[in-house]
């Protein structure tokens, strides 16, 4: 089941850097942890936007936005609902950030999904169907009332900043969960042609030993 109909990955730069478009990233220093999803998929972004000669600077996640603010790097990759709020916490106004979401720049990858083991699918598909039905019901309630959903999180983790996390959740809902594509395909479902293109691009970006077969990784018989 697809949860994030679009990848939350994005490139972010400060307007004062002079970077305005994806083409401006050529020859620049970019920063992200080595395992960052946006960094891993950047070859696809670069190909779609004719970006070349990027130098990568690696850092631990807590330093990513700090290094951008300090000018140690020209741009960063990260999830929108993480890095945008982290930049704000470091004194950067939203209007001073150049945001290039992968989904808006030729990289229509799916994001987080629910994965089931093939053995479980074969032996107990009904249990998966019931779980997905419960998840879908809960997701609908969260989308309808994000603030109330965060209160449930707060009840289990008292140090949660409800204002900040409500904004983060709403940003995630608006950009990757309750998107136009999700409305078109249906919550939890996907477009086979789009998945096939993504599989090919991911195979190229990650240098997989074998090509990814979309028919092997997607099973909608239990949705």
Go through the PLM ranges and name each one.
Residues 43-47, 88, 154, 203:
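Class I S-adenosyl-L-methionine
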Residues 43, 85, 196-199:
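Predominant activation on well-ordered alpha-helical scaffold segments within soluble catalytic domains
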Residues 195-223:
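Conserved C-terminal helix/tail region of periplasmic/extracytoplasmic solute-binding proteins
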Residues 1-60, 65-70, 74-81, 100-102:
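Short, glycine-/small- and polar/acidic-enriched structural segments
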Residues 63-66, 70-161:
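Pocket-lining segment of extracytoplasmic ligand-binding domains
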Residues 123-205:
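Secondary-structure end/capping motifs
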Residues 53-56, 94-97, 159-173, 208-216:
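Short, surface-exposed acidic
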Residues 21-22, 192, 214:
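Structural motif detector for alpha-helix initiation sites
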